[in-house]
């Protein structure tokens, strides 16, 4: 969700231990397979694959699953799927703008499942281009704070093209132009700073604040979309204050 709110951080932690863990594993494994197919199966020569593997390991995906996905993607092992990325656009409750990114081997299934989740939870689909113009593609690095200070992080990434560093309580978020993403990644590595993820994301150009009632409705829609096997990422232009995030965390 846009803004990477503290509520989102709480939701992600909760998701790691609830019944959706298997879905998250499947997403991460799918990303490994696609990265290996696009850039080759050697993590040392394919930064995207290396980061996908690191992210999967941090989420406790079994090594066997990781290795099989790498081999399927690189062609070392049979059984890989013909994945394609599809972006659906729509509006949630309260007119909240939404982008739903899918990675699927069945375009018709993905479209049907996304549309069903949207219509059953107060959302509606939109024509291509009618929502996406409200978002821009950015490079993003997420890092657990630990002993890391914002000053140390800024010192490491500013010359590499970082545009903004956001403090989300237990995490830092670094945003940059997508052309600078690999430079930021290398700057973090050179500084010995461990990161959780480095990837391309969508960020809304103008965020819309939501009260607790609207945020709950949108959260329910996001949960329904998250249950769709083909859905990889969901982006919105909704922002949630610390107070609303705290209220939702108690739900």
Curated annotation (Swiss-Prot):
It holds the Pfam family TACO1_YebC_N. Residues 56-79 are annotated as: Disordered. GO terms for biological process: regulation of DNA-templated transcription. It is found in: Cytoplasm. GO terms for molecular function: DNA binding. Keywords: Cytoplasm, DNA-binding, Transcription, Transcription regulation. Coiled coil: none annotated. One of its GO terms (cellular component) is cytosol. InterPro entries: Integrase-like_N (IPR017856), TACO1_YebC-like_2nd/3rd_dom (IPR048300), TACO1_YebC_N (IPR049083), Transcrip_reg_TACO1-like (IPR002876), Transcrip_reg_TACO1-like_dom3 (IPR026564), YebC-like (IPR029072). Belongs to the TACO1 family. This is Probable transcriptional regulatory protein cu0933.
